[in-house]
């Protein structure tokens, strides 16, 4: 046998041995556990914690549309001093230095996966529900930890407390518009606070349809409470309803909140101004 054939035979033998050494069923793409932390936070404020119902979080595979994880963010709002008052480098953790609300899950990934992460909240206040999302590339086994994937929600939580929605207003009467103003995390807006109302635009409006009848100056009354007086003009004789709107916005209007209530109007002859008596609230009809 020539030297050439001997070499070829040796190479074939070595190749066969190496092939036999690697199991034919070996799977190099087995799923690997990949922890992921997501935090839904209020813009320029803190995490959406249990006090506002937390936030709904969904992680979805961008390519397939499959939901990889879903649940609710739980926990406390966080440490205000560390989050709002302590200077941080851009790369330093802020929300995870001390405990704050988050959503934690463990995904099983077998390849680099582009995901869409969606957060919605605050769940306790559906009338101001906000939504934010990000696309993030996750790598199998690379844990997303620390502050995690941060989703920031813009807006303010505004709620008109008085007049109550069940009380008609009388033409010619004076009244007081009172509302609470908070960040979406439930954090209190007040003068000289972490969320300084002096740097915000807060006011009320008396409205007839789309027309502003009166702009109402409001003043701080208590923690997160602002109030101002209004008067319903007698010129509205014959009108059936009137609306009060409370508007709140931060300095550059990145965060805005509005609440509006429409009230039945009673004629001047039945008003408090004319009768000297409070107008009775609307009594809901009894069920049959």
Task: Outline where the language-model segments fall.
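Short, surface-exposed loop/turn segments at beta-strand-coil junctions that are enriched for proline
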Residues: 231-238
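Short, compositionally biased P/S/T/A/G/V-rich stretches that sit at domain boundaries
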Residues: 137-189, 268-288
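Aromatic sugar-binding surface patches on proteins
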Residues: 78-103, 222-230
